[in-house]
Amino acid sequence: MNATPQPPTSAAPVRLERDGSVGFIVIDNPPINAGSLGVRQGLIAALGELAGDASLAAGVLIGAGTTFIAGSDLREFSAPLADPQMPAVIAAIEACPKPVVAAIHGAALGGGYEIALACDARVALADAVVGLPEGTFGIIPGAGGTVRLPRLTDAATALDIVSTCRRVKAPEAKALGLIDAAVDELRPGAAAFALSLKGAKRRLRDLPAKPVEAEAFEKAATAALKRGRSRPYAQEQVAALRRAFEAPFDAALAEERAVFQRLRQSDESAALRHLFFAEREAARIDGLEGAKPLPVKSVGIVGAGTMGSGIAAAFLAAGLPVTLVDLKPELLDAARQRVAGFLAKAAKPAALTTSSELGALAPCDLVIEAVFEDMAVKQDLLRRLDGIVRPDAILASNTSYLDLDAIAAATAEPARVVGLHFFAPAHVMKLLEIVRGAKTAPAVLASALKLGRALGKVAVVSGVGDGFIGNRIYNAYRTQCEAMLLAGALPEEIDGAIEALGFAMGPFAVSDLSGLDIAWANRKRKQAETGDHSDVPVLEWLVAGGRLGRKTGAGWYAYEDGRRSPDPAVAGLVVKARAERGVTAASLGRETIQNRAMAAIVNEALLVLEDGIAARPSDIDLVLINGYGFPRHLGGPLWWAKTQDRQRLEQALQALQGLKRRGDLARLD
């Protein structure tokens, strides 16, 4: 090996660097070295150069910067793919007469790992990860991933890796056979491995699939279909891995590519790609140019209930020490046990401090109130905290409905107040609504966004308004579903229709899970504020009868052994409500229920945009997907609305009951 590598002979995004008898093919396409058209062209050219240079005995594929190839360029997927496509790159690697080793640091994902699988060997740094996460985008690997992977590890394990979309860390990857070696220094380690092959090719296409244990594979297939809710991509994942050991190599390869192309062009894949880009767009906030986040190295939380405990667990899991305060000391022991149960071994118990004194929060960089949803209670607490915490500390409210500006007004410096609306369970749910008050300082908002990333949340900024983005839209949806009770449907019929669309749960099942008293308390608050008592009275009657949902064994449904079932008593209350309102019930079909429910969501989402509560349609899609069980494969309510026939959507909006405002469908354009 030369002490000083020779300078590159070709330009970015791919170049060949000579170092002794090893040619390093360097992918330099920041930030993630995506396998774009330019990279594909460059790889084929560099492989040809490697093959034609008699002074080079072997090649090494390596990424510049922080990663190997972390995936394909998704921006290309919405149009016909330009040649050369990824299979041509794979073929060029296999056709190269000299051994080629993939040197992996950072991540080799999707098409990046498929390129590594085409190589004659794979070496990686200990902290590298590999994986085939194409299912995230509603597709399967399209360049041999499902055909080559079962030649390194058994088909059941391969299916698990493909269907979970998980990133396999190098030590596990080595144990499973996904890489050949873990090295301490990537460049010299890869070069040494390449030369150790002594010119021999080790193509996976020349190997048979690993022996198959039928029972293990069928178990993995059942799990994959359940995980993917039998969506088309999940069915094709199973079929592709089955072909890998049942069909000839090239036949399996050709069918995999055909399925990939078909799924890539599907509505579901387009919706999932939309969500991928929406998450990145959500971080771009007007007015934050140059804003520097404040350092947050310790967190205080007031309120040791389920929500406060979940928030504490989320921060502890992210490595931040937490001080949890509740003015009722008897609640703290239960909270500590709850947090420990949430975390298991994810964080050291010593990182959690509990106290019944607000003064314990004085050193914290961020203090979050997670107390009862009552304006006076929250204002009083913020007023007291304002005199305890440091002047440069951030104060946050976990309110899910209330006016953040009114809460912030209780402090001497509203600029340091921001809304951090977590969703229960807070250590699990991906969504974090960040509420920007009228006086919230840019640095405080920037800090909240940075914290959202640190917690692994999908953070979306909302303006101030009752219910912010998500709860406002959800309330409109729930109101319309209750109106359909009067019109002629029953809770189980509405929930069944909604769940058939792909929602995790229908609105009445959700209400039973969260507690009818929660919904009723919010409804009473709004009635007091607006004087509007037009809501369907069934909820009020259920609460008055002590039917609060799952926690009392009865709500919209009856619960026996934890299983929900329709309750004739609820049907009787619905009939009573119809009689009181003078409504003659009509049969509502599943499609009618679905159309009205979706139209209610779309209409309120359009109004949220119109009122400036959400910055962009894609932010609303993220909120409904990550916090409210909206079907991910539909891409969110406004993405879905854009794909619908405009005239039919207009008719569905017109059919909504008791609508006070109509959203403008032109906003979809």
Spans of model-derived segments:
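N-terminal glycine-rich phosphate-binding loop for ADP-containing cofactors
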Residues: 2-14, 28, 40, 80-88, ...
